[in-house]
């Protein structure tokens, strides 16, 4: 019997990246698509608690899928607890745009969905495809085509390996980033701290009042061994991520700082 995969994303159910992942996985698994109805990039792991969530069964590309009126995390929760899919694996992506560095995984809806699945006890992988034109991240994801041949191969090979060999015991999410032009092989990496230099652009509205765009150029010189460096070299970056954000190395220092404190 084929393994079961819940497939989701943050670019929305019409995204060509989502359906590229479906095409890659359908031959090796029983895949159910449960994805946001609309674009949900950069929502991180946010969750809908002040409004109801609707999940509509739809047919796309000849496939029965579920369109969720919410965020990527909502889609995972609906798939696990409302639809009771009981997947062996949750796959999120393929995202249009790289999700590299600690900075990105904290804001990415793609990685957020994978983190939610992992927090619910389901092994998960997030896949993202680097874009050469940053504007592609903000275009209609249903119109981004003809760039998924490498991504499909990576999605299939990576998931086949994980399903055959088991999920790494000390990891909760595997974050995979695919270069726009693959020139090397697979590289096991760690998270860089940042992908972008943070900047703010101030503009004025017609009434002369300021408003702001958060923007900034990409890092060009990433440290060797990081996910950013690997993708810049044309390698596929595979980064193990854990849910435990505890800084154990700081525990003794904190104990010394707060020793003797009483309330």
Curated annotation (Swiss-Prot):
Reactions this protein catalyses: a ribonucleoside 5'-phosphate + H2O = a ribonucleoside + phosphate
NCBIfam families according to UniProt: PRK00346.2-1, surE
Keywords annotated in UniProt: Cytoplasm, Hydrolase, Metal-binding, Nucleotide-binding
Cofactor, how bound (note): Binds 1 divalent metal cation per subunit.
Record bears the keyword tRNA-binding: no
Subcellular location: Cytoplasm
A GO CC term assigned to this protein in UniProt: cytoplasm
Domain of life: Archaea
Cofactor: a divalent metal cation
Major enzyme class: hydrolase
Function in brief: Nucleotidase that shows phosphatase activity on nucleoside 5'-monophosphates.
The EC number(s) this enzyme carries: 3.1.3.5
Protein name: 5'-nucleotidase SurE
Single Gene Ontology MF annotation: nucleotide binding
Coarse class of the protein's main subcellular location: cytoplasm
């Amino acid at each position: 019997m084929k393994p079961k995969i819940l497939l989701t994303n943050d670019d929305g159910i019409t995204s060509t990246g989502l359906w590229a992942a479906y095409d890659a996985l359908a031959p090796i698994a029983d895949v159910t698509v449960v994805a946001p109805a609309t674009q949900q990039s950069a929502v991180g792991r946010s969750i809908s608690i002040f409004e109801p969530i609707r999940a509509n069964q739809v047919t796309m590309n000849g496939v029965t899928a579920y369109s969720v009126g919410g965020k990527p995390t909502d889609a995972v929760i609906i798939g696990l607890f409302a639809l009771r899919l009981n997947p062996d694996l949750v796959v999120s992506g393929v995202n249009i745009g790289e999700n590299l560095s600690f900075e990105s995984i904290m804001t990415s809806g793609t990685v957020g969905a994978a983190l939610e699945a992992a927090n619910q006890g389901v092994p998960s992988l997030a896949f993202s495809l680097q874009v050469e034109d940053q504007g592609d991240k903000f275009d209609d994801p249903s119109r981004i085509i003809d760039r998924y041949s490498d991504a499909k191969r990576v999605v299939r090979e990576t998931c086949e390996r994980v399903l055959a060999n088991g999920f790494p015991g000390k990891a909760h999410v595997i974050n995979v980033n695919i270069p726009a032009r693959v020139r090397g092989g697979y590289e096991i990496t760690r998270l860089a701290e940042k992908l972008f230099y943070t900047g703010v652009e101030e503009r004025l509205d017609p009434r002369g009042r300021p408003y702001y765009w958060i923007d900034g150029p990409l890092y060009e010189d990433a440290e060797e061994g990081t996910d950013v460096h690997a993708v810049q070299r044309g390698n596929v970056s595979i980064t193990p991520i854990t849910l435990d954000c505890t800084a154990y190395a700081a525990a003794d220092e904190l104990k010394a700082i707060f020793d003797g404190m009483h309330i």
